[in-house]
Regions:
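Sec-dependent bacterial lipoprotein signal peptides
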Residues: 1-19
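Short beta-strand edge/turn micro-motifs at domain boundaries
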Residues: 20-30, 121, 133-168
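Short, well-ordered alpha-helical segments enriched in acidic and aromatic residues
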Residues: 55-72
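Surface-exposed, charged secondary-structure patches
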Residues: 84-136
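Loop/turn elements at helix/coil->beta-strand transitions in domains of secreted/extracellular proteins
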Residues: 58, 101-103, 155-158
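Extracytoplasmic/secreted proteins, especially bacterial periplasmic and envelope-associated proteins
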Residues: 37, 41-44, 48, 60, ...
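Short, low-complexity N-terminal intrinsically disordered segments enriched in polar/charged residues
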Residues: 19-55
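A short gly/proline-enriched turn/hairpin at secondary-structure junctions
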Residues: 70-82
């Protein structure tokens, strides 16, 4: 009996040590932080927007826009606001994604916010970098006045209006 205990006391530590791989990479505690939050959060919409631009993916981008989406910008040369709907926005974005080698958008700190749990308007600063080729890189810094809507508290937010408030 005493001999069996000694053998077990010797075998269990060996079994435990055999499960440890000193060459395995460490556990990445931050990996989950790179995944986008749910679309029930505004941050989730912005994260997916960033991913759509980074991966040049119109499917991701299209899922963020409401069917009645409107894009608006100011044409300072003519002194008028120019706008278009979701269909034209998707066509223009597809063209941008096809012509750019890489895209990067960084959403800066929230500048202003108003609304409630079903409709919210938020103004963000952004930095957009469009690389057409290594010698043709466009950088745009501006402000996006975004209006988000959702049907219910647990429903995903959709962008219904994007007013570009950049001055270029």
């Amino acid at each position: 009996m005493f001999r069996h205990k000694n053998i077990l006391l010797f075998i269990f530590p060996l079994i435990y040590l055999s499960c440890i791989n000193p060459f395995a990479p460490g556990w990445d505690d931050e990996a989950g932080q790179q995944i986008c939050p749910n679309l029930t959060e505004i941050e989730g919409v912005l994260c997916n927007f960033r991913n759509a631009y980074s991966f040049k993916d119109t499917t991701i981008y299209g899922n963020l826009l409401s069917p009645d989406f409107t894009f608006i910008y100011r044409d300072y040369d003519r002194g008028v606001d120019v706008s278009w709907g979701r269909e034209e926005e998707m066509r223009i974005t597809y063209g941008l994604f096809q012509s750019a080698q890489s895209l990067s958008i960084i959403w800066n700190k929230e500048i202003a916010s108003s609304g409630d749990s079903l409709r919210k308007t938020v103004v963000f600063g952004f930095n957009l970098t469009i690389t057409f080729n290594p010698s043709d890189i466009a950088r745009v810094d501006g402000y996006a006045n975004l209006t988000f809507e959702r049907v219910g508290f647990t429903s995903p937010w959709k962008i219904v209006r994007w007013r570009d408030e950049s001055n270029f």
